[in-house]
Amino acid sequence: MEICRGPYSHLISLLLILLFRSESAGHPAGKRPCKMQAFRIWDTNQKTFYLRNNQLIAGYLQGPNTKLEEKIDMVPIDFRNVFLGIHGGKLCLSCVKSGDDTKLQLEEVNITDLNKNKEEDKRFTFIRSETGPTTSFESLACPGWFLCTTLEADHPVSLTNTPKEPCTVTKFYFQEDQ
């Protein structure tokens, strides 16, 4: 293949750079077009998520209750980091530290308004790690704390800093909702 070195080669190079630049380039400080996607999520014990009294619960939904299943809304920030929410991205999952206690909260925030470069939005960021068919989510604000469920059904979705403990489940199946 021969490289063209004519009078317009610099102009062509510039146009190609502009055409193929990253989607966040040219947007102010971390603002980028957000593409929210909805996913089905269930843990390795087949428990799905549902909302009860403004708390995210993991349990076995059957029959007419299957319509209570919450889809997880996800906005990718970069290759591994994501924002997670429910209810069309209007309630976002966050990791909050209070003294020695670290807990998962649902906050009324629009997921597409979050900004990866804002320190106050760090609590909404999760590191998505895939291992084979399963996915785990580690808090960026609280390293070592993972999204988890318990072995028992109908308990709150929470965070754990002991992901290998046998009574917690930190591996999830994650499938784009059709």
UniProtKB/Swiss-Prot annotation:
Residues that carry a glycan: 110
UniProt keyword annotation of Transport present: no
Keywords recorded for this protein, A-Z: Disulfide bond, Glycoprotein, Secreted, Signal
Primary location: secreted
InterPro entries on file: IL-1_CS (IPR020877), IL-1_fam (IPR000975), IL-1RA/IL-36 (IPR003297), IL1/FGF (IPR008996)
GO biological process terms on file: carboxylic acid metabolic process; cellular response to norepinephrine stimulus; chronic inflammatory response to antigenic stimulus; female pregnancy; fever generation; immune response; inflammatory response; insulin secretion
Cysteines joined through disulfide linkages: 92-142
A single cellular component GO annotation: extracellular region
Coiled-coil regions, chain positions: none
Cell compartments where the protein resides: Secreted
Signal peptide (residue range): 1-26
SUPFAM superfamilies: Cytokine (SSF50353)
Example GO molecular function: interleukin-1 type II receptor antagonist activity
SMART domains per the UniProt record, alphabetical: IL1
Biological role stated in the UniProt entry: Anti-inflammatory antagonist of interleukin-1 family of proinflammatory cytokines such as interleukin-1beta/IL1B and interleukin-1alpha/IL1A. Protects from immune dysregulation and uncontrolled systemic inflammation triggered by IL1 for a range of innate stimulatory agents such as pathogens.
Family: Belongs to the IL-1 family.
Protein name listed in UniProt: Interleukin-1 receptor antagonist protein
Organism of provenance: Rattus norvegicus (Rat)
Taxonomic classification: Eukaryota, Metazoa, Chordata, Craniata, Vertebrata
